[in-house]
Amino acid sequence: MPAAKGWLVNTVVDKVKKMVPAYHLPRAVSFKRALRMGAGLGVTRHPVTLDDVAVLQYTGGTTGLAKGAMLTHGNLVANMQQVRACMSQLGDDGHPLIKEGQEVMIAPLPLYHIYAFTANCMCMMVSGNHNVLITNPRDIGGFIKELKQWQFSGLLGLNTLFVALLDHPDFKSLDFSHLKITNSGGTALVKATAERWKAVTGCAIGEGYGLTENLASGQYQPLRRPVAPGYRGHPGAGYGDESRR
């Protein structure tokens, strides 16, 4: 049944909804073929250190072809713990604002991008929180329909997505009583968007700064303090901050 379901979903997405653009990848090996090729092979364990490369994270934010940034095991672990420290900020009750294993985080951005890869895939994993993956965030009506099923406490997005949600007539009917954190990244946050979001949801949008080359969260705003659009926040735990001209 899983194989039949997968075939049905792929067929609808590709042939009916036409969501897959035409492409050609020379010498490409499909994921299913790779699984078949490796089915009879054993696992060879290789010792690794924190300085060994764990991920080739590709970025289009460069001249020419997309380039893969080499991220080490130590880089991934350190960044997860830095974000974990940020989420451990205390509320008025003396307890962490973001509670491990109890939060529902909405993940509408692609996990192949460094922002969602770090914040959702890596950092929610280490904190034991639940990610809700939004498969097609461009379908704003479907996005909002999915949000209605959850008492979500966090949402990561970017300016254009926030505007699209705010402009939809059904967005205001959502329950925002559990929303503790909204974060914007990838592009600049417009002041008018931040003000509209705060007025509708009651939750201010935080911003940060990071690079693909060192993972996404180099600097971020405190969770409890009022935020000002354009302010990138403080360096994360263990980070240095130096401005050069």
Q: Where would I find each of the regions flagged by the language model?
A:
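Gly/Ser/Thr-rich phosphate-binding loop
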Residues: 4, 8, 19-20, 129, ...
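Conserved AMP-binding/adenylation subdomain of ANL enzymes
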Residues: 77-104, 112-153, 168
